[in-house]
Amino acid sequence: VRRWWPLAVAFLVTLPAATTGFVLDDWVQRGVVHGKFDHTTKLALFNFGAGDAEALAPYIQRGPYPWFTLPELKLRFLRPLSSALIVFDTEVFGARAWPQHVHSTLWYVALTAVALALYRRLVPGVAAFAAVLFALDDAHVMPAGWLANRNAVVAVTFVWAGLLAHLAWRERGWSAGALVSTVCFALGLAAGETGVAALAYVVAFEAIGRGAQPWRERARGLAPVALVVAAYVVAYKLLDAGARGSATYVDPVSEPFAFLAAAPARLFANLGTQAFGLPDLWLVFPGAQGLVVASGLVATPLGWLAWRRWAPMDAAQRRTLAWLALGALGAVLPTLATFPTARLLTAASLGLAALVASLLAAAWRDVGARRWLGVVWLGGAFVLQPLSQWVALPVAFDTLSTRAADAVRALAVKEGERVVVLSSTEFIPAVYAVPLLVELGEPLPRTWQVWSMAPLAVDVRRTAERQVELEVLGGRMIDSMFEENFRGAGFPLVAGDRVPLEQATVTVLAVDGGKPTKLRVDLALPVSEYSFVWWNGDVLERLTLPDAGQTLHLAKAQTMFERLVRGPRAPD
């Protein structure tokens, strides 16, 4: 019975997620399935920008994309299998979220079963322990608990099932293994880009896992991977998938210099996040990004010292752990295309769990202070802290989705009204309000135009009957990660740039380093035809524009994350 404990752990840790509902991208994807949004199709639910200015124009002119969105923005990810699973859930289970979370739980248990099978083959002495660490890994919390992120679990499940078949083919001569692994690799890539990261283990195994062998033999072993990846790259380009124009997602093929510039900090941030079990500070608290990078710089020599002290003496076992570690490092590299976060490390966790289990087992047998140093560090980072995340994330998601629903309901949107978000320091009501209104079955506005989503105070000055100037104080627009998702620094704006919206035109009046600090909006209709709102730190609140010549000051309000962590406070 003990041999199956890892599967029980995988099942139990995902249970809290079953109590949460739908959140963020779930709202958008469910809206597409129900035919409420026409920017993409049911089998392309991860298309958030097609790279086509004409196709994106209505979503900028009417909203909810902010006015500064790059017209050619491309955020188009090729995940047809994962899209199909979401369509299945939506059409079979409807508005009931819990069965869809149970569906995710089953995938997570299957993933843990595949990992356990690999560990029994590769690290039999610590297989069950490694699989428990794997099941607890906080890198899996969001992929297993957020429906829109399930694609990562599905992708690595198939790829690592293919790795099992690959090992049987290469080490035991199972001839069907080549075909089975090829099919599994293809299914994994059809589920999501995380499958590419998971393939790093196959490459690492062929590179150093089999010891000395002719290059021709290594090439033979890599043939299934090469075939699938080549077909995948062709499909990716033919379907015009990829990312361009966003600072959040950088395509290493189309934007190699931007990728290389961002890669070092992102690499060490990811290493530190995994080594010390850090929560997603990079995303939630941008001011802590330097600390996250520093944690990775500290973790690197600590990891090397732990290896020197506690690595197994057996040469074959050291070689196995070495190729698993190399595979884990290789799995991190594709994640550098986007911002550092624990959920990107799903593919890296296979090798890390085996490595940590082996080192912890050796540390436990050590003597003196070294033993407790290793046990406290590795045990705390890879056991205790992840357990807290499995409980905390569902609570946070449930709280955020409830508060977001309360915030948009409080606005009492009228069917067909023209809503203008003057300022929202919180990105959820700024850009997710319309999908959330669809999910809630509330009346929909005709337009939802976002003028500022900078985390700054704003002055709104009425300069004429139908003219408004908006100036951010103490900073710049498009300078936070959520804003840069819509326009990267490589696409600067200049004073005089004009952006047409529906019944309004935005003109950039002043910039700082290509990022606006002041803009003018000319309204085509009387002010009474628009509904002006702002995020006050609690709800979306309606406002009345000041008289001509007067200024309205909107303070910097708390975000939902800040309110959740620090408690409520008045706007600055």
Please describe what each predicted stretch is.
Residues R409-V419, S424-D572:
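C-terminal luminal/periplasmic domains and tails of membrane-associated envelope-modifying transferases
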